[in-house]
């Protein structure tokens, strides 16, 4: 069975079915911030070290496989679906995943509502951008909801999977407008936090996993999404998550684009707080400045264009032109790309090498 094809002109592999034999992943990032993303939006993110500075949680032996990632739920009427198919696994009218050089784009549709999601790590920035464009291809106005969702790792990926008697009491977040700040251990011993934000006013949010999923719930049908109503939960211990609720209305032919940012923010020790440390007001200056860099579709697309230019230049120094198309493709695109990913990761993180053993990257 064929699951996709190579698009040499765009340096992409195009996956045409979400039901691949195993998750087919791409690596986002070229310097310090990295994300792994599968063809169904599974994966995780980390800053420099996949063991000690992991932003989002991933369960390697989960059932079903690859069922934790960076997700967007679209709820229209009684239908709930995801641009990458997982985790709702609703049959889609159209689906494509384009794994490119440092970015992945998902194009899918359901009931004349089209979604295009592009995930990438901008050059020189410690963040992942998710640009989500929604288009109404019907002849009637569409009213629906979008729910974002990530599950935060408590930084140390090994400890996160083992030290439960402690972990269940340490998770901590705060919310300001459309920005969610994961600040576990920031007060005690860290000078960094994670940011998850969107460039639009939200109609609700959630930061507590059990509140979002519901009692005995699961991420294929979260209680918040099914009910179409966020709970505005604030995590205190247990499992912190990030979820934004956006109510969207599209006229026939209309499109809207939202830019989500997942970032690692580090403050100098002497600048951890605004005012007195006892007041507990984290310094959000760097986070707010980063959000402004990607607060429009135009800024996001400019960063994506810069990333593509970066890879085009990197791959331009050695080329082969032969009578064998497959050889040219391997040498000119994918072999070089694989070598750079291996160099950046130091073979430290994948879906099979967890990054927890030595967690070392370059």
Model region roles, listed by residue range:
Residues 1-362:
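Anionic coordination/interaction segments
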């Amino acid at each position: 069975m064929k699951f996709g094809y190579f698009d040499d002109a765009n340096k992409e592999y195009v996956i045409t079915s979400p039901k691949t034999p195993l998750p087919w992943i791409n690596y986002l990032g070229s310097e310090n911030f990295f994300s792994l993303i599968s063809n169904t939006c599974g994966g995780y993110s980390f800053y420099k070290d996949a063991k000690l500075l992991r932003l989002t949680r991933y369960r390697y032996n989960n059932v079903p496989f690859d069922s934790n990632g960076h997700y967007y739920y679209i709820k229209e009427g009684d239908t709930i679906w995801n641009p990458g198919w997982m985790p709702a696994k609703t049959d889609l009218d159209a689906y494509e995943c384009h794994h490119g050089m440092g970015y992945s784009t998902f194009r899918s549709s359901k009931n004349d509502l089209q979604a295009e999601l592009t995930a990438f790590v901008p050059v020189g920035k410690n963040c992942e951008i998710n640009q989500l464009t929604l288009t109404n291809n019907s002849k009637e106005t569409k009213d629906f909801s979008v729910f974002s969702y990530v599950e935060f790792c408590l930084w140390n990926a090994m400890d996160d999977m083992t030290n439960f008697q402690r972990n269940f009491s340490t998770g901590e977040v705060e919310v300001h407008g459309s920005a969610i700040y994961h600040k576990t251990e920031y007060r005690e011993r860290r000078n960094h936090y994670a940011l998850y934000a969107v460039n639009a006013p939200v109609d609700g949010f959630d930061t507590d996993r059990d509140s979002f999923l519901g009692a005995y719930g699961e991420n294929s049908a979260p209680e918040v999404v099914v009910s179409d109503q966020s709970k505005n939960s604030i995590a205190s211990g247990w499992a912190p998550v990030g979820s934004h609720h956006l109510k969207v209305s599209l006229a026939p032919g209309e499109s809207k684009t939202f830019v989500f940012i997942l970032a690692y923010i580090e403050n100098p020790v002497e600048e951890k707080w605004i005012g007195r440390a006892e007041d507990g007001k984290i310094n959000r200056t760097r986070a707010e400045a980063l959000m402004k860099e990607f607060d429009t579709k135009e800024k996001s697309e400019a960063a994506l264009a810069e990333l593509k230019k970066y890879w085009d230049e990197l791959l331009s120094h050695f080329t082969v032109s032969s009578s064998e198309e497959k050889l040219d493709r391997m040498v000119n695109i994918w072999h070089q790309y694989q070598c750079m990913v291996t160099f950046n990761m130091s073979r430290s993180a994948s879906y099979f090498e967890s990054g927890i053993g030595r967690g070392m990257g370059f």
